[in-house]
Amino acid sequence: MSDFLFPIIEIFLGVVLLFTGGEFFIQGAIFLSLILGIPQIVIGLTVVSLGTSSPELLVSLSSILKGSDSLAASNVIGSNIFNVLVVLGISSLITPLKVKSRIVRRDVPLLMAISCAVWAMSSTGLLTLQAGIFLIFCLILNTIWEINTINEKGEETKDAEPEIEELKDNYKGKMNILLKLILGIFLLSFGSNILVNGSQTLATLLGVNEIVIGLTIVATGTSLPELVTSIIAAFKGKTDLAIGNVIGSNLLNQLLILGSCSIFSGFKGLVIEQSLIKVDLPFMVLTTFACLPIFWSKGKITRIEGFILLNLYIFYILDKILFLNEFNFLSELRIGLFIYFALLIVFLIVQEKLKFSNS
């Protein structure tokens, strides 16, 4: 019993630090967007997503240095799945998330293309040094692209002009914003590390496979900053930040983290296990493709769609549990899950087409 006590305390402390860090970070990000006149969707896609992706980056690079390629890759894949299904799912249950047209026109198609490229490059079982350089190059191009949208001044700045002017002329106020951002990132990163350490220790004591640990416990632990930040943003009515955080984080997870891990692995490349290539990467791509019709329909993510996303994650976790217990009909269950997911995407597309034709 004493062996389990310390990791449980670590998990609890990690969650507390994550919630505290998420609150500080989201406050700083909101005021930063107001002062600079940057649309909150751009802040969500860049500053917030970079801050909340820092735990994934630290954990994955640490895994590479320790020779654990499986943990590094499964962490990224599992985090991307968690972000779409759980983070967007729970956030939309709190309040329906309005989706701006630039997300549908630009960011989701880009995420779809990058996800397919990562899957294709990983199909040989190796994400090479050249692939890593390509991903980092795409990251640089995407960052330049996002910076060019800064001129799209957000409407939210017009409603807060007095507050903005006061902050602009107040040195103490500026330092307070910077302090909140730095403290938020620190608490998010530190909290995630404690949580992951506790989760890994607990999973090891229970005898769980490393890939499954990466896809579930570690991915959930490192994705909690995204979850906490998006939930806080949803409660504050900042749906741009909630959505932008998820899309931006998923882009960074693949471009920055997988790119960096591939480069850090050197000429040997980052090893991608066959189980990830055959099951989890395709599922990640499907969750990404599901974003487009969901965002497209009604211009928002409804509570019903959020509920569906959460159910899909429950199916995914069930698959991992049955895999651990060597379930005899696991292949049939996976086929059924993929068919269900594909039908869901088709249903959402047809629903939107019918709505468009009737309008």
Where are these regions (language model features)?
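Hydrophobic alpha-helical segments, chiefly the membrane-spanning helices
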Residues: 1-359
